């Protein structure tokens, strides 16, 4: 038989309250103490990935052009001594006058003498002598009882003499001739657009240089353009990721 059947329903809460009061006050069970400990463990993991790109090298030819202007001042003085003019001059970096000219041999301007035409003499002479000798044969003389002398013509010698003598003299004056050389300038390069400051030093880049020789003339082909600011650097990309994991143990 159950106790709940013996105790009326209105007395059941009172019975439970009495059982709670009769429980021991400490938690000891056979000298064993139960302690609950809560521990939190934090674990951090870091992964680093490095990606290296291909390294490229670019070489630029930079030509810096600067212009510097120099100013020179010249003073000249001409004096006549015994009818012979002498010219003296001086050059300085500051303004000078005729009073600053020192008449000495170092400052004298000497004109170079003009060259006279070169005289070439050519002489040509020819002499020829022709002599011709023609002998005449003697006729034979026959002997007879009655001998009649036959006149014998005298030996005749014909001499022909011809003397030719001529002397020709030719004088030629060599004159100096001046030939003007025509200078031609051809510009086939690219046209540079945009304003360029006169206060700065500009740079140009020259690339793809090649030479070709044709008929004794050397042609140089190259590409050039105005150089602006260029950044030549080796790029390396680094990716870094951090993974954090928190583990809680009860």
Curated annotation (Swiss-Prot):
Keywords: Cell adhesion, Cell membrane, Glycoprotein, GPI-anchor, Lipoprotein, Membrane, Secreted, Signal, Virulence. It is a lipid-anchor; GPI-anchor. Residues 232-250 form a propeptide. Residues 111-173 have a biased composition (Low complexity). GO terms for cellular component: extracellular region; plasma membrane; side of membrane. Disruption phenotype: Affects yeast-to hyphal transition. A lipid is attached at residue 231 (GPI-anchor amidated aspartate). Residues 1-22 form the signal peptide. GO terms for biological process: cell adhesion; cellular response to starvation; filamentous growth; filamentous growth of a population of unicellular organisms in response to biotic stimulus; filamentous growth of a population of unicellular organisms in response to starvation; fungal-type cell wall organization. It is found in: Secreted; Cell membrane. Residues 99-175 are annotated as: Disordered. Glycans are attached at residues 64, 182, 208. The keyword Plastid does not apply. Putative adhesin which may be involved in cell adhesion and virulence. Involved in the regulation of filamentous growth. This is Filamentous growth regulator 41. It comes from Candida albicans (strain SC5314 / ATCC MYA-2876) (Yeast).
